[in-house]
């Protein structure tokens, strides 16, 4: 009885660890994919703007995102995104 309870708990612990690792990898993959899709190509700058538009790469310490469009530089992803709730 004790052995079967121990095996059941060990199995549940193992299932939790596997699910957590899978979810963590999935989040990292989606963040990398989003960052690569929205990455700024330095070779094709085109016209210089006073501020950066949505999805443009930015530096959080020097936020150059367009304030008139309610954009802020995301510290986590390092691209301009809409500021929600302001």
From Swiss-Prot:
In this entry, which stretches build a coiled coil? none
Give the similarity note: Belongs to the neurotoxin 10 (Hwtx-1) family. 22 (Htx-4) subfamily.
Q: Where in the cell is it found?
A: Secreted
Q: Which cysteines are joined by disulfide bonds?
A: 51-66, 58-73, 65-80
Q: Per UniProt, what does mutating residue 75 to A do?
A: No important change in activity
Modification type Isoleucine amide: residues: 84
Signal peptide (residue range) = 1-21
Name of this protein: Mu-theraphotoxin-Hhn1b 2
* Keyword entries, A-Z: Amidation, Disulfide bond, Ion channel impairing toxin, Knottin, Neurotoxin, Presynaptic neurotoxin, Secreted, Signal, Toxin, Voltage-gated sodium channel impairing toxin
The record ties this protein, via InterPro entries, to:
Huwentoxin-1, Huwentoxin_CS1
Q: Point out the annotated site residues (description: Interacts with channel).
A: 76, 78
Domain notes per entry: The presence of a 'disulfide through disulfide knot' structurally defines this protein as a knottin.
Any additional notes? Several genes are coding for Mu-theraphotoxin-Hhn1b for which the structure by NMR has been determined. The cross-references to PDB can be found in entry AC D2Y232.
The protein's assembly and partners: Monomer.
Q: Does the keyword Disulfide bond apply?
A: yes
Role this protein plays:
Neurotoxin. Selectively blocks neuronal tetrodotoxin-sensitive voltage-gated sodium channels (Nav) with an IC(50) of 44.6 nM. Does not affect tetrodotoxin-resistant voltage-gated sodium channels or calcium channels.
